[in-house]
Curated annotation (Swiss-Prot):
Gene Ontology annotations for the cellular component aspect, listed alphabetically: large ribosomal subunit
Function statement: Forms part of the ribosomal stalk, playing a central role in the interaction of the ribosome with GTP-bound translation factors.
A GO MF label: structural constituent of ribosome
Any coiled-coil regions, as ranges: none
Name the UniProt record assigns to this protein: Large ribosomal subunit protein uL10
InterPro entries: Ribosomal_uL10 (IPR001790), Ribosomal_uL10-like_sf (IPR043141), Ribosomal_uL10_bac (IPR022973), Ribosomal_uL10_bac_type (IPR047865), Ribosomal_uL10_CS_bac (IPR002363)
Record note on quaternary structure: Part of the ribosomal stalk of the 50S ribosomal subunit. The N-terminus interacts with L11 and the large rRNA to form the base of the stalk. The C-terminus forms an elongated spine to which L12 dimers bind in a sequential fashion forming a multimeric L10(L12)X complex.
UniProt similarity note: Belongs to the universal ribosomal protein uL10 family.
Keywords assigned: Ribonucleoprotein, Ribosomal protein, RNA-binding, rRNA-binding
Claim: Signal is one of the keywords in the record: no
Signal peptide: none
GO BP: any one term: translation
Gene: rplJ
Keyword check for DNA damage: no
Amino acid sequence: MSEAIIAKKAEQVELIAEKMKAAASIVVVDSRGLTVEQDTNLRRSLRESDVEFKVIKNSILTRAAEKAGLEDLKELFVGPSAVAFSNEDVIAPAKVISDFAKDAEALEIKGGSVDGKFTSVEEINALAKLPNKEGMLSMLLSVLQAPVRNVAYAVKAVAEKDEEVA
C-alpha cells in the first residue's frame, strides 16, 4: 500500500476512535439485506434522534476500538458492520434500531457499548424499552411533585373543614 493510503486509514482509525471515546452509547449492527428504502428510513430515524450511523470496515473498527480502550467490541466486528454513535442520549440508538429491527428482519443487532462498557444484544433490547430522556425526566418530576400535591390537598381539606366549622 502506498503511504498516502496508510496515512488516510490511520486518520480514519483516529477519527473513529475519538467518536468511540466520546460516545455515550454505541450499537453495532449487521444491516446486510436491508432494501435501499429501509436503509434510508433507518438513517433518517437515527439522524432525527441525533445518532450518527456509519458503515465502516472491520479492520478500521478493530484498530479504533483498541485505540479507544474498547477491546470487548472487537468480537462484534465480524461480517458486515454498521455502527451507530450517540454522544448525548444513551437510549436513542438502541431504541431506534430495536424498533426498526421489529419491522426489518434483515437488521441484526450484534451488540454495543454503553458508557465504555460492553453491552450484549439482550441489554440493548432492554435499554430500548426504557423511556427516552424527556420521558424519564417527566416521570421524575411527577414523583417529586406527588408529595407537594398531597400536602396541598391536605391543606385545602383542613381549610375547607375550618370553613364548615365556622
